[in-house]
């Protein structure tokens, strides 16, 4: 069974919903299974640390989750065109995996949600790709053969699924965005199975 890690950070719930849809797509591929994980908030040393286990939702990711996965879907809200600090913090701690090439050759995709339509979706997606490329992962984009990519009037890019959440994070995922997330999960899982041989 090819285990696909769907790793995300979500504040208002939009990125979490996208992660669940990508996981749904993964689960539609025979021989693949999705594993949902999140990361704790990053707090200054003067603030209280996050609990070791989240009170609800997906468990926190550990390095062993990354090492064991056959593929990775990485999701973050966009903050000034970049991935959120908690995900960056996690990847800053992956040097031991990088040193032994634990992620090299594995497929990965990225997804995001932003509060404004031009809120840096594509640069956020690109910022998430950088550590994945350093790890030697194979980036799996969203091709224009996916018809919703050409038809969407909200989120969706060839770099990966995206969602326009609104400033209050109150915009639901559109039908086109939903279809793109599910298709991305299926594409990632299929690629993981092909690369495993």
For each of these PLM feature ranges, what is it?
Residues 92-95, 99, 113-116, 134, ...:
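Alpha-helix boundary/capping detector
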Residues 1-102, 164-197:
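N-terminal beta1-alpha1-beta2 submodule of the flavodoxin-like/Rossmannoid cofactor-binding fold
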Residues 104-154:
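Short, glycine-/small-residue-rich phosphate/pyrophosphate-handling segment
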Residues 13-14, 72, 76, 82, ...:
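Gly/Ser/Thr-rich helix-start
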Residues 39-44, 136-168:
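Mobile beta-alpha loop/short-helix "lid" or hinge segments that flank ligand
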Residues 126, 156-158, 175:
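Glycine-rich phosphate-binding loop at the start of an alpha helix
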């Amino acid at each position: 069974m090819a285990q696909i890690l769907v790793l995300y950070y979500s504040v208002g719930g939009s990125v979490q919903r996208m992660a669940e849809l990508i996981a749904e797509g993964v689960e539609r591929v025979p021989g693949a299974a999705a594993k949902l994980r999140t990361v704790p908030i990053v707090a200054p040393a003067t603030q209280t640390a996050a609990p070791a286990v989240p009170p609800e939702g997906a468990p926190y990711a550990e390095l062993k989750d990354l090492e064991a996965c056959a593929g990775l879907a990485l999701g973050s809200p966009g903050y000034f065109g970049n991935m959120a600090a908690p995900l960056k913090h996690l990847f800053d701690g992956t040097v031991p995996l990088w040193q032994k090439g634990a992620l090299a050759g594995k497929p990965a995709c990225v997804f995001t949600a932003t509060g404004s339509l031009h809120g840096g979706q594509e640069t956020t997606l690109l910022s998430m790709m950088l550590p994945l490329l350093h790890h030697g992962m194979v980036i799996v984009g969203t091709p224009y053969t996916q018809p919703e990519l050409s038809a969407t009037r909200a989120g969706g890019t060839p770099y990966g699924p995206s969602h326009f959440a609104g400033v209050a994070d109150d915009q639901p995922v559109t039908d086109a965005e939903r279809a793109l997330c599910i298709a991305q999960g299926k594409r990632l899982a299929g690629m993981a199975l092909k690369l495993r041989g």
